[in-house]
């Protein structure tokens, strides 16, 4: 029996769809299986929904004040924006590109040959790619299932996109969990006129971030009206009439809706992975550095493998892996993924102002390296920030004494764009001095790099100056030691 396809991709995620487009561009025969049970079938770009909400919250607040009451308009705007993002990868357009798009539930089978069985149709291919992504964990909170809650999967469907239908937006929210999406959404909802309570089990919000930056974000949220419980555990949840009660110790919080911001779990159910010899754990599918599973014809990428970036699941990382997996599945010459290099991929938390980082945080670097310099610059002295009246924020750049950049953390209006400069510098192994060899636009936020380099030069100048004072003393000490050895020998 001949092979029907070169590559069969399983998953409705944005990464699965981009992988299908990548494969068809390589002249491959491609089938894309969109599982019916996947929430990503309706919203493959769901990760961008809170960001779209945040954008409309910012543009509706020219004076940076809270809206007095929540409106359904921002939600409908965000839904429309997501719909536009999803148009280029809709099933109809994918089919027009020559991709066989099949909606349904299926599983792998190994007899008489390896195939993917969907509605009794056996799809045979040279290789298979699993990019099903992840879904929300079921929170282990007494009463939560009976009371009801919202996750990122369900958030776009909370308010539909019908502009003519009047809908009520929940006014009081409890957000439970320490994932970055919870912090982002808490701030956005507060700006949209909602009363928000953020509950995290950790000692700080954004536990993977530098404490100074996390504290600055926390102060910003509290200034905007978000009530934050740190190191708190929700003991139970119950419903009373139209109100939901969240119990934290002796405190009882009355809300209209609960959002769960816990880490997702890999979507692995019903694919018969054990039957075809694909190893996996509760954290995800086991893969090697070529994104190949324990079955040589089956590849996997993204959050279904449990891969994270900066402590969080990342759509950009998933898309990066999807391209490599497609090329490895179709070519004999394999590209290896350097998992250590994941530490040098940029990451951002889209609060206002946003936080971005790459490489090591200052806390991590101090624990693992010696002779470090933490270069710190505040944007309140940056001309562009002053002209834009957006002076909140600062940056930390972790460098060695030789100038090698180990990591950077930035919090300011343009942090996601600025971090790209330092990410490329780390990847290309440039020093902080190398970054000053080309002129920087002025005024611009990027001027902080020049200022950081000046700080590094000042440190070395002062250090060398201090060393000069002690050089004669060191010479006398060495001479005394030599004389002592000579006398002892005689």
Q: Residues of each region from the PLM?
A:
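Flexible, glycine-rich terminal cap/loop adjacent to redox cofactors
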Residues: 10-18, 22-50, 55, 352-358, ...
């Amino acid at each position: 029996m001949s092979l029907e396809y070169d590559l069969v991709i399983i998953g409705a995620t944005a990464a699965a769809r981009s992988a299908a487009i990548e494969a068809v561009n390589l002249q491959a025969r491609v089938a894309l299986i969109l599982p019916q049970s996947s929430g990503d079938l309706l919203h493959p770009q769901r990760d961008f929904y809170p960001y779209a909400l945040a954008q409309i919250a910012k543009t509706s607040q020219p004076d940076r004040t809270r809206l007095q009451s929540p409106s359904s308009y921002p939600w409908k705007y965000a839904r429309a924006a997501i719909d536009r993002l999803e148009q280029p990868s809709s099933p109809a357009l994918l089919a027009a590109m020559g991709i066989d798009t099949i909606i349904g539930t299926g599983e792998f089978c190994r007899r008489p040959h390896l195939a993917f069985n969907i509605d009794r149709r056996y799809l045979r291919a040279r290789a298979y790619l699993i990019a099903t992504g992840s879904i929300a964990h079921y929170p282990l909170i007494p009463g939560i299932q009976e009371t009801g809650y919202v996750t990122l999967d369900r958030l776009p469907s909370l308010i539909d996109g019908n502009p003519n239908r009047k809908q009520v937006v929940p006014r009081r929210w409890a957000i439970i969990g320490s994932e970055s999406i919870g912090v982002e959404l808490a701030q956005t909802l507060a700006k949209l006129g909602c009363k928000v309570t953020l509950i995290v089990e950790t000692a700080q919000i954004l536990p993977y971030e530098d404490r100074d930056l996390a504290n600055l974000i926390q102060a910003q949220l509290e200034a905007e009206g978000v009530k934050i419980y740190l190191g708190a555990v929700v003991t139970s949840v119950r419903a009373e009439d139209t109100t939901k009660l969240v119990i934290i110790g002796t405190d009882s919080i009355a809300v209209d809706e609960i959002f769960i911001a816990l880490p997702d779990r890999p979507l692995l159910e019903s694919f018969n992975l054990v039957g075809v010899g694909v190893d996996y754990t509760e954290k995800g599918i086991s893969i090697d550095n070529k994104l190949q599973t324990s079955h040589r014809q089956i590849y996997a990428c993204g959050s279904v493998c449990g891969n994270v970036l900066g402590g969080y699941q990342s759509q950009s990382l998933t898309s990066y892996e999807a391209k490599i997996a497609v090329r490895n599945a179709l070519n004999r010459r394999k590209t290896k993924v350097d998992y250590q290099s994941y530490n040098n991929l940029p990451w951002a938390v889209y609060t206002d102002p946003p936080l971005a980082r790459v490489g090591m945080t200052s806390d991590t670097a101090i624990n693992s390296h010696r002779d470090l310099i933490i270069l710190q610059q505040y944007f309140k002295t940056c001309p562009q920030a002053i002209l834009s009246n957006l002076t909140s924020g600062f940056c930390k750049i972790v460098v060695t004494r030789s100038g090698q950049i180990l990591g950077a953390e930035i919090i300011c209006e343009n942090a996601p764009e600025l971090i790209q400069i330092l990410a490329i510098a780390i990847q290309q192994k440039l020093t902080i001095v190398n970054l000053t060899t080309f002129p920087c636009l002025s005024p611009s936020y990027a001027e902080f790099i020049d200022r950081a380099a000046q700080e590094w030069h000042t440190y070395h100048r002062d250090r060398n100056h201090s060393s000069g004072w002690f050089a004669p003393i060191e010479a006398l000490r060495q001479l005394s030691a030599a004389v002592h050895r000579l006398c002892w020998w005689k």
